[in-house]
C-alpha cells in the first residue's frame, strides 16, 4: 500500500471518487445561493467552488503530465459561468488520462519532486474536504465516504501541527459532542463548525 492510500483503493480511484463527490455537491447549489457566504471565512460559495475547481484542475494536470502551479488555487483564477460543467469536463479528462498514467512518474509538489501517487494526495484530499464545505455552506452536514475519509485523515495526521495550523491552512481544532460522526470529528479537528445549528 502506498503512502496515504486506503487499503484496496488506489489514488486514481480516490481521485475519481473525490471528483464525483465534488460534482454532486456543486450540482445541488441553488442558483440564488452562489454569492452567499460559505463556511470558510472571507469566501462566498462561488469562491469556494472556484478554489476547488483549481484543485480539480491540478489533479487532472498532474495525471496528464502537464505543468502545474505550486500555490493554492486562487478563486478569481477559476470562476466561470457554469462551474458544474467545467468540473464534468475535468472529470472526463481525468478518466481519459488515468489508464495510461504512470503513478511512479516524478511530479512537482509542495514537498519537492515526488512520485505522481504522492503528488496527488493533497489536491485529492482538497476535493473531498471542500465537497463537505460546499454542503456545509448550505446548512447541510454530510458524511464523506469511508475510504476518502480514511485517506484524508491519514494525510492530515502526517502533517506536523505547526504546518497544519499555519495561516491559510486550517484553523484550531474545535470541540465535538461525544456522538459526533467520524466525518464531523475530522472537520472539527480542521477548525470547521459541525454544530447542526451553527
Question: What are the residue ranges of the model-derived segments?
Answer:
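Short, residue-level hotspots on alpha-helical faces of the histone-fold
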Residues: 51-54, 126
Amino acid at each position: 500500500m502506498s503512502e496515504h492510500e486506503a487499503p484496496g483503493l488506489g489514488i486514481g480511484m480516490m481521485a475519481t471518487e473525490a471528483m464525483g463527490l465534488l460534482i454532486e455537491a456543486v450540482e445541488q447549489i441553488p442558483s440564488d445561493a452562489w454569492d452567499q457566504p460559505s463556511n470558510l471565512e472571507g469566501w462566498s460559495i462561488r469562491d469556494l467552488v472556484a478554489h476547488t475547481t483549481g484543485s480539480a484542475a491540478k489533479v487532472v494536470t498532474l495525471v496528464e503530465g502537464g505543468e502545474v502551479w505550486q500555490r493554492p488555487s486562487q478563486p478569481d483564477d477559476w470562476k466561470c459561468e457554469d462551474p458544474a460543467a467545467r468540473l464534468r469536463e475535468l472529470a472526463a479528462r481525468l478518466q481519459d488520462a488515468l489508464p495510461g498514467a504512470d503513478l511512479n512518474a516524478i511530479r512537482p509538489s509542495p514537498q519537492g519532486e515526488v512520485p505522481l501517487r504522492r503528488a496527488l494526495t493533497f489536491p485529492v484530499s482538497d476535493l473531498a474536504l471542500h465537497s463537505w464545505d460546499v454542503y456545509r455552506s448550505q446548512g447541510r452536514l454530510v458524511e464523506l465516504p469511508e475510504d476518502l475519509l480514511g485517506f484524508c485523515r491519514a494525510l492530515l495526521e502526517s502533517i506536523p501541527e505547526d504546518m497544519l495550523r499555519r495561516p491559510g491552512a486550517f484553523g484550531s481544532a474545535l470541540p465535538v459532542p461525544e456522538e459526533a460522526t467520524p466525518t464531523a470529528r475530522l472537520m472539527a479537528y480542521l477548525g470547521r463548525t459541525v454544530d447542526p445549528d451553527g
